[in-house]
């Protein structure tokens, strides 16, 4: 199974992606780990694109879970190849407290979904990204366009309850279909659509 997890910052994309990786047995790629080098330095774009392309090619048959938006990192290919696209469409009133909690939890160290040496931080730029810039009219339109191009694959999650329900459904499907085919795909995912 190939799953893309996209959405707003601090909506829980990385947490969901990690859980989906555990459930499916597929490798997980956190695009923040691709984007950043230690000390929050940005990786060369060509190198980053190459890393994503290599991951997609190496896991073509096995399947994958990819966490993150990053339009420049083969986004259209990722969406086209994905069996499912989870869009974390959480409101600011949920994302901001989650970002503050994450900052407290990982203060002074890197979380699992970011490069080593990128210690968790909360600054004005990131707060503005969560509250305003990351939800600009242009960004919202990009998400709408993506959903219009792949309507049968997108599952919109607007609150934690949606995520729990989705994971419970995937658990049930996996339990009913313990025999995975040779590509690692969970069969029966048509219930999600």
What annotation goes with each model-predicted range?
Residues 9:
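The conserved Walker
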Residues 2:
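Walker A (P-loop) ATP-phosphate-binding motif of ABC ATPase nucleotide-binding domains
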Residues 5:
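Hydrophobic anchor at the beta1->P-loop junction of P-loop NTPases
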Residues 90-138:
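A glycine- and Lys/Arg-enriched "phosphate-lid" helix/loop adjacent to the NTP-binding pocket
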Residues 18, 22-62:
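Conserved substrate/cofactor phosphate-moiety recognition/catalytic segment
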Residues 23, 131-193:
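NTP-dependent small-molecule kinase module
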Residues 13:
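Conserved lysine of the Walker
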Residues 51-96:
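Glycine-rich phosphate-binding loop used to anchor ATP phosphates in small-molecule kinases
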């Amino acid at each position: 199974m190939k799953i893309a997890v996209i959405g707003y910052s601090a909506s829980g994309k990385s947490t969901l992606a990690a859980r989906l990786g555990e459930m499916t047995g597929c490798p997980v790629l956190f695009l923040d780990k691709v984007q950043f080098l230690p000390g929050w330095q940005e990786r060369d774009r060509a190198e980053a694109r190459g890393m994503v392309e290599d991951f997609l090619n190496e896991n073509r048959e096995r399947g994958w879970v990819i966490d993150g938006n990053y339009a420049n990192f083969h986004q259209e290919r990722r969406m086209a190849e994905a069996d499912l696209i989870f869009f974390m469409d959480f409101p600011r009133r949920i994302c901001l407290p989650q970002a503050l909690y994450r900052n407290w939890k990982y203060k002074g160290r890197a979380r699992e979904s970011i490069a080593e040496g990128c210690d968790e931080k909360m600054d004005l730029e990131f707060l503005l990204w969560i509250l305003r810039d990351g939800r600009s009219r242009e960004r919202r339109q990009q998400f709408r366009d993506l959903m219009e191009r792949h309507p049968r694959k997108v599952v919109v999650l607007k609150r934690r309850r949606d995520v729990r329900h989705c994971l419970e459904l995937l658990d049930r499907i996996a339990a009913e279909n313990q025999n995975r085919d040779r590509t690692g795909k969970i069969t029966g995912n048509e219930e999600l659509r």
